[in-house]
């Protein structure tokens, strides 16, 4: 594909050389100058700390035949750095990158049934449920999200909840080549704010909820909501919106969505998809689901009201795509869950119940504790921490929630990154009443061991915050660490004592 066709309808300005250079053949796209090869087009993406476009001379030196950068990047590294380079300017790099990537990979999103799920919590479980329903209906489906990018015959660990525009379009194109007919993906607020899903039109967009998180990036809840809301308007929304009516921000979003383009779901009220006659238990929930096609009995192995909301959102999305309600409900009992989401680490009958979960926001931690409480006969022990270099304002809130809903709390490290772990722990403790039974143990392995060894039969130990993660970030170093492995070690020590 030549450069001229890639630039069609993009907000770009060719600075040098003359237009004859636009007939150059482009054989690859890169956003990292260090990965450029001969024939590549380098897209200099602005970041939160560094504008990647400033490395355009390095991209040319590595073999890139043309570069597109922002005015800011050009000011940092002017044309004199390489007078012969084919240099193109864009003041809307996310729009430009998305359009170019989609064109280069032959518009894969237009070939697929595309489902996007956004929200603070519930994205991963909801996308897995939609994937489960589509595969059960013999619709070969790609899944892109926090854990991995996968489809039948292929799987890789995800680097981001939502890939960058060039990587995303490449993934979708590969999925199309593999015979996929649909793709369901988690769409993060960062991705929407940074234009990573530009070039994608979604047949279904699902909104799960919005609670405090990522304020280190967005600054305010209003800005956070505005980023999420972009998914529910053109050019992203080309089909139906599916919105959680139990969420206050969901209610706002409903009023912003064009009439006839929105379906709602609710666990506690009336909506297009809602529930009655619910019976919660330690092995899940059963009851009746009301839909536009009538009422149906159902049974789900997923524990907790929040997981019922995820199920309703997924069923509404599947129905929008034409899946019969009966087909979806028939396979709900077979859903095995998601790694690191209410995942039980199995021990012996004399051991406490140990649950690992990704809950790392105030709302998700509260939901986790409330969901676990009815099924724990003894004390509920919560082990958690908060990530460093991230939203600091949620730390005391999570401390208060844990102290209020758990019988015992052990505060520990999560991914401290470049922050002082002692300061993170102090921020959490600041939200906890002085009389609460709280232990502070910065070493996460020691905290998990202490919780499990001190627990009595019938107690529950919740290890919150890291879920599926098999690493811990200390400073700028990533080391191997898995809550589930640490729990198994502690259970084995307990059993051998």
Swiss-Prot record:
Gene3D superfamilies: Mur ligase, C-terminal domain, Mur-like, catalytic domain, MurE/MurF, N-terminal domain
The enzyme's E.C. designation: 6.3.2.13
Entry superkingdom: Bacteria
Residues the record lists as binding ATP: 119-125
Positions of modified residues (N6-carboxylysine): 228
Coiled coil: none
Motif (Meso-diaminopimelate recognition motif): 414-417
PTM remark: Carboxylation is probably crucial for Mg(2+) binding and, consequently, for the gamma-phosphate positioning of ATP.
MF (Gene Ontology): ATP binding; magnesium ion binding; UDP-N-acetylmuramoylalanyl-D-glutamate-2,6-diaminopimelate ligase activity
Residues the entry annotates as binding meso-2,6-diaminopimelate: 390, 414-417, 465, 469
Biological process according to GO: cell division; cell wall organization; peptidoglycan biosynthetic process; regulation of cell shape
Top-level EC class: ligase
Obligatory cofactor(s): Mg(2+)
Keywords assigned: ATP-binding, Cell cycle, Cell division, Cell shape, Cell wall biogenesis/degradation, Cytoplasm, Ligase, Magnesium, Nucleotide-binding, Peptidoglycan synthesis
Cellular component, GO, one term: cytoplasm
UniProt function note: Catalyzes the addition of meso-diaminopimelic acid to the nucleotide precursor UDP-N-acetylmuramoyl-L-alanyl-D-glutamate (UMAG) in the biosynthesis of bacterial cell-wall peptidoglycan.
Classification via NCBIfam families: murE (TIGR01085), PRK00139.1-2 (NF001124), PRK00139.1-4 (NF001126)
Family: Belongs to the MurCDEF family. MurE subfamily.
Entry protein name: UDP-N-acetylmuramoyl-L-alanyl-D-glutamate--2,6-diaminopimelate ligase
Organism: Synechococcus elongatus (strain ATCC 33912 / PCC 7942 / FACHB-805) (Anacystis nidulans R2)
């Amino acid at each position: 594909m030549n450069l001229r066709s890639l630039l069609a309808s993009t907000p770009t300005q060719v600075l040098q050389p003359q237009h004859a250079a636009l007939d150059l053949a482009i054989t690859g796209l890169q956003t990292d100058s260090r990965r450029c090869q001969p024939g590549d087009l380098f897209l200099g993406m602005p970041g939160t700390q560094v504008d990647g476009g400033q490395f355009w001379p390095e991209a040319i030196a590595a073999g890139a035949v043309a570069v597109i950068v922002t005015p800011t990047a050009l000011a940092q590294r002017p044309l004199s750095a390489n007078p012969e380079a084919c240099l193109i300017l864009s003041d809307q790099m996310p729009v430009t990158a998305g359009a170019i990537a989609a064109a280069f990979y032959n518009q894969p999103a237009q070939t697929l049934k595309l489902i996007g799920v956004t929200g603070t919590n519930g994205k991963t479980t909801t996308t897995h449920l939609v994937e489960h329903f589509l595969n059960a209906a013999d619709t070969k489906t790609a899944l892109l999200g926090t854990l991995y990018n996968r489809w039948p015959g292929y799987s890789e660990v995800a680097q981001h909840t939502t890939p960058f525009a060039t990587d995303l379009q490449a993934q979708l194109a590969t999925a199309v080549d593999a015979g996929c007919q649909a793709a369901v993906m988690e769409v993060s607020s960062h991705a929407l704010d940074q234009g990573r899903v530009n070039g994608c039109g979604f047949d279904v967009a699902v909104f799960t909820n919005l609670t405090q998180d990522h304020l280190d990036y967005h600054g305010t809840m209003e800005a956070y909501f505005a980023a999420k809301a972009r998914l529910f308007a053109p050019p992203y929304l080309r089909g139906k919106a599916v919105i959680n009516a139990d969420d206050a921000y969901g209610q706002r979003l409903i009023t912003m969505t064009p009439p006839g383009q929105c379906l709602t779901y609710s666990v506690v009220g009336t909506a297009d998809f809602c529930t009655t006659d619910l019976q919660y238990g330690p092995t899940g929930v059963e009851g009746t689901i009301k839909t536009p096609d009538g009422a149906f009995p159902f049974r789900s192995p997923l524990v907790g009201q929040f997981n019922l909301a995820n199920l309703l959102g997924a069923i509404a999305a599947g129905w929008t795509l034409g899946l019969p309600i009966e087909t979806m409900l028939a396979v709900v009992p077979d859903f095995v869950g998601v790694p690191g989401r209410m995942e039980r680490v199995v021990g012996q009958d004399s051991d406490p119940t140990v649950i690992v979960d990704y809950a790392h926001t105030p709302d998700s931690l509260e939901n986790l504790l409330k969901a676990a409480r009815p099924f724990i006969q003894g004390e509920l022990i919560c082990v958690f921490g908060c990530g460093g270099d991230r939203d600091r304002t949620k730390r005391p809130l999570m401390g208060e929630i844990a102290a209020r809903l758990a019988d015992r709390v052990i505060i520990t490290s999560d991914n401290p990154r470049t922050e002082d772990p002692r300061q993170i722990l102090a921020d959490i403790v600041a939200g906890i009443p002085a009389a609460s039974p709280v232990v502070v143990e910065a070493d996460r392995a020691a905290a998990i061991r202490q919780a499990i060894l001190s627990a009595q039969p019938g107690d529950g130990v919740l290890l919150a915050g890291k879920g599926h993660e098999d690493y811990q970030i200390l400073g700028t170093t990533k080391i191997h660490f898995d809550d589930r492995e640490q729990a198994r070690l502690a259970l084995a020590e307990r059993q051998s004592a």
